[in-house]
A protein has these predicted regions:
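Conserved N-terminal phosphate-binding loop of PLP-dependent enzymes in the Aspartate aminotransferase
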Residues: 2, 70, 121-123, 130, ...
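Condensing-enzyme catalytic core mediating Claisen C-C bond formation in acyl metabolism
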Residues: 2-31, 230-297, 301, 308, ...
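N-terminal extracellular/periplasmic Venus flytrap/periplasmic-binding protein-like
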Residues: 15-17, 28, 37, 48, ...
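Conserved beta-ketoacyl condensing-enzyme motif
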Residues: 26-117, 122-140, 196-220, 293-294, ...
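Conserved catalytic cysteine-centered active-site region
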Residues: 29, 61-115, 149-156, 228-255, ...
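Short, well-ordered amphipathic alpha-helical segments that serve as non-catalytic structural scaffolds
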Residues: 31-47, 72-76, 101, 155-161, ...
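Active-site-proximal alpha-helical scaffold in enzymes
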Residues: 91-123, 162-192, 262-269, 334, ...
């Protein structure tokens, strides 16, 4: 027996600042501690809400092992002081893990299975390297030529996209400079203050005079990545990293990062029960596969699918958070779909702000939720390419 789907409302959205990896502010901060901070700061936005109603914590993590293993979702929920009745599940769709967690939470509420869920993402690229501590790829990927692309490094896939979509080195560098410019301007204007919960880190250093270890507390309130001095001339001097005659460099690629984001998603029943003000509604989500060797073009397929599911047109979207894994793939997607550049990453993207893999979707969702309200816009989208050849896109409506 079918029943009408109900709406899934986002009532809280918060994140940590994004730290540079592996030598940034969070180099000694465990990922579960970052997750705890994001969860606590999100819950603090709705003090009238009873956390006993949360049924599950769904947390995205791209490399869920070592310090972010042992089901980091459950660990984070417990360490954040949530009731032990709150479950926890860690989900992995590489770079789209965080937005997948949010979509899963929204789906369970829409079909009436749950009334309150926590959706989050976390990643420490300082403590857990991008491929994990002991990567082991199936040898069978070399059995068929169609599967060879699975073995490509992400940078090499970006080179393939740049070549196939004819994205020049100069265009990539120009795009990257603009990412930093927008991020610096946004920081100076206080655009991130609604979404970022400042994080206090304790630094320890030897006191040579006393022979003891001194401590100093430092508050991190802004993302570490943006550089005001970034210039086209400076980026042009960088050597290519992944191909001898390529165009992809460290300067026009996303930064490795540490961070976490969390959102509270509830049903209309809970809204009314606690008289909560909804920040946004999660509208639709889509994932589509593409050849692994050109994984960066994934959003080209996912964006139209998410729009169709929402009954919207491309022009209806006011704010697009397109994860800047690489300038090459971002520009290829923008040009292929004819996206309006003025709507893309208005506060800067991953090239400047950083890309903590599994946390990115949740972090960028928090950016969209608060950004739409601050600028009085209607629809926002979070979209990204995904390693092994996928694209993901989620649409959010301001209420």
């Amino acid at each position: 027996m079918s029943k009408q789907l109900q709406d899934a409302y986002i009532v809280a959205a918060s994140r940590t600042p994004i730290g540079k990896a592996p030598r940034g502010a969070f180099k000694n901060t465990r990922p579960d501690e970052l997750l705890v901070h994001a969860i606590k700061s999100a819950i603090a936005q709705v003090p009238e809400f009873d956390t006993k109603l949360i049924e599950d914590a769904i947390v995205g993590c791209a490399i869920p092992e070592a310090e972010q293993g042992l089901n980091v979702a459950r660990m984070g929920a417990l360490l954040a002081g949530l009731p032990n009745t709150v479950g926890g599940v860690t989900v992995n769709r590489f770079c789209a893990s965080g937005i997948t967690a949010l979509a899963m939470a929204a789906d369970r509420i829409r079909v009436g299975e749950s009334d309150a869920l926590l959706a989050a993402g976390v990643e420490s690229m300082s403590m857990v390297p991008m491929m994990g501590n002991k990567p082991s790829m199936s040898p069978h990927i070399f059995d068929r030529s169609e599967d060879f692309g699975i073995a490509y490094g992400m940078g090499l896939t970006a080179e393939r996209v740049a070549e196939q979509w004819k994205v020049s080195r100069e265009d990539q560098d120009t795009f990257s400079v603009e990412s930093h410019r927008k991020a610096i301007a946004a920081q100076q204007a206080g655009e991130f203050k609604d979404e970022i919960a400042p994080y206090a880190i304790v630094e320890r250093f030897p006191n040579l005079a006393t022979g003891e270890i001194d401590t100093k507390t430092r508050e991190i309130a802004l993302d570490e990545g943006p550089r005001a001095e970034t210039s086209l001339e400076g980026l042009a001097k960088l050597k290519t990293v992944f191909a001898n005659k390529g165009s992809v460099t460290a300067g026009n690629s996303s930064q490795t990062s540490d961070g976490s984001g969390a959102l509270l998603v509830v049903s209309e029943k809970v809204l009314k029960q606690f008289n909560l003000t909804p920040l946004a509604r999660f509208v639709s989500f889509a994932v589509r596969g593409v050849p692994p060797e050109i994984m960066g073009i994934g959003p080209k397929e996912a964006i139209p699918a998410a729009l169709k599911a929402a009954g919207l047109k491309q022009d209806d979207i006011d704010w697009i958070e397109l994860n800047e894994a690489f300038a090459a793939q971002s520009l290829a997607v923008i040009r292929d779909l004819g996206l309006d550049p003025s709507k893309i990453n208005p506060l800067g993207g991953a090239i400047a702000l950083g890309h903590p893999l599994g946390a990115t979707g949740a972090i960028r969702a928090a950016t969209v939720v608060h950004g739409l309200r601050r600028r009085n816009l209607k629809y926002g989208m979070v979209t990204m390419c995904v390693g092994t050849g996928m694209g993901a896109a989620g649409i959010i409506e301001r209420l």
